[in-house]
């Protein structure tokens, strides 16, 4: 049994979100939530919300036991970048890329070996 949750166009760079995702990959959901709760990174809040959504999906849609769930897969892909302009001296301008990320979390019970 698997349950999926996604956060598309998350306002953080994929590089920064991957640092957080790598910490919880393969852990049980209660351990992962504990790590994310006390992480000082902004991306930890985003990943935690997606993980909580995946847990709720597993409980509601599949009737899963929350204590048996673990983070089977967690992926952070790049989303589109928003282009912004910062004015500079002598009429020039610099381009700023405000990056986004797509965060995908898959939780499964221990019986579904992967």
From Swiss-Prot:
SUPFAM superfamilies attached to this UniProt entry: Ribosomal protein L22
Signal peptide annotation: none
Keyword Ribosomal protein attached: yes
Function: This protein binds specifically to 23S rRNA; its binding is stimulated by other ribosomal proteins, e.g. L4, L17, and L20. It is important during the early stages of 50S assembly. It makes multiple contacts with different domains of the 23S rRNA in the assembled 50S subunit and ribosome.
Native organism: Aeromonas salmonicida (strain A449)
Protein name per the record: Large ribosomal subunit protein uL22
Gene name as annotated: rplV
Coiled-coil intervals, chain numbering: none
Family annotation (NCBIfam families): rplV_bact
Keywords carried by this UniProt record: Ribonucleoprotein, Ribosomal protein, RNA-binding, rRNA-binding
One of the GO BP terms on file: translation
Ranges that cross the membrane: none
Cross-referenced PANTHER family: CHLOROPLAST 50S RIBOSOMAL PROTEIN L22-RELATED (PTHR13501), LARGE RIBOSOMAL SUBUNIT PROTEIN UL22M (PTHR13501:SF8)
GO cellular component, one term: cytosolic large ribosomal subunit
InterPro entries associated with the record: Ribosomal_uL22, Ribosomal_uL22_bac/chlpt-type, Ribosomal_uL22_bac/org-type, Ribosomal_uL22_CS, Ribosomal_uL22_sf
Assembly description: Part of the 50S ribosomal subunit.
Pfam families referenced in this protein's UniProt entry, alphabetically: Ribosomal_L22
């Amino acid at each position: 049994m698997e349950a999926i949750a996604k956060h598309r166009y998350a306002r953080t760079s994929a590089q920064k979100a991957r640092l957080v995702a790598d910490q919880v990959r393969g852990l049980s959901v209660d351990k992962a939530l504990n790590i994310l709760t006390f992480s000082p990174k902004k991306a930890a809040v985003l990943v935690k919300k997606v993980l909580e959504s995946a847990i709720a999906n597993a409980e509601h849609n599949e009737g899963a036991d929350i204590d048996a769930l673990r983070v089977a897969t967690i992926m952070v892909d790049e989303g589109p970048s928003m282009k912004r302009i910062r004015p500079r001296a002598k009429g020039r301008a610099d381009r700023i890329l405000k990056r986004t990320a797509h965060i995908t979390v898959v939780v499964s019970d221990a019986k579904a070996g992967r």
